Amino acid sequence: MADRAIRTVLDGMSYLEGPRWHAGRLYVSDFYTGDVVAVDLDGGANPETVANVPAQPSGLGWMPDGSMLVVSMRDRRVLRVRDGGAPEVHADLSELAPWHLNDMVVDSRGRAYVGNFGFDLMSGAPIRTAGIIRVDADGSAKVAAEDLRFPNGTVILPDARTLVVSETLGGRLTAFDLGDDGTLSNRRVWAKLSETADTEDLGELIAAGGVAPDGMALDAEGAIWVADALGGPVLRVREGGEILEEISPGTGVFACALGGADGRTLVMCAAPSFAEHERRDTREALLLACEVDVPRAGLP
């Protein structure tokens, strides 16, 4: 496997998630400051706060008109930011999501697919399954898929007919056919990364080890880069589960994206841990980057 030179793009952050390459810049959410930040990947980072989401930002995406959608985790809303204005409510998902929202992908028609925790992760509550919620361009919403073990990072393949979601507590990437009407069907395992303990006890599941797939990015060869929320590395995975490459920056990595002018810059959201009580009042999170061989593809 190639020896990748890893550099720091941004430091002094609380906990970064939802990295996205859009219109020549890298956008990322900082959980505990509430900031959505845009940075340059070439030369100086030149960070700019483009929105603030007090109830904790996560997944990001863009509507066909160029306005930005931001997941607001704790109040279970999707917000919309138009032309640098204040965030406004695009969809309230509090009746559909049993606990905090997390990552999101937005398709070319402005439909958002949003994951959620399903249970109180940070308090160690019993594990519960959750669903993917589809938010249509007009803000209406419905559950699109159910019974997933912590649906999280999500990508849409270039043909716009396949959606793949990481089941963080299921040790797998799961694929669906994506219909013209936005429906998800034909659920199947895209890649099984590890066996997971058959338990509702979060501590027991974590102690058992294995891969916990989190945020991810698709490349032009159809492989997916996925962050392992338990082990720290970023894995390049082929459909069927073969691991093609592993990058270990020496700290935890919880999300990744491909971007840069040629689409070959792999950006990683890194921190010593994901525990809220360890991250909320510290500023140890990093945005890391390295160059890879195959450029980005699909969405986000």
Name these PLM-found stretches.
Residues 31-32, 73-74, 119-130, 168-170, ...:
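Short, solvent-exposed loop/turn segments at conserved positions within beta-propeller repeat blades
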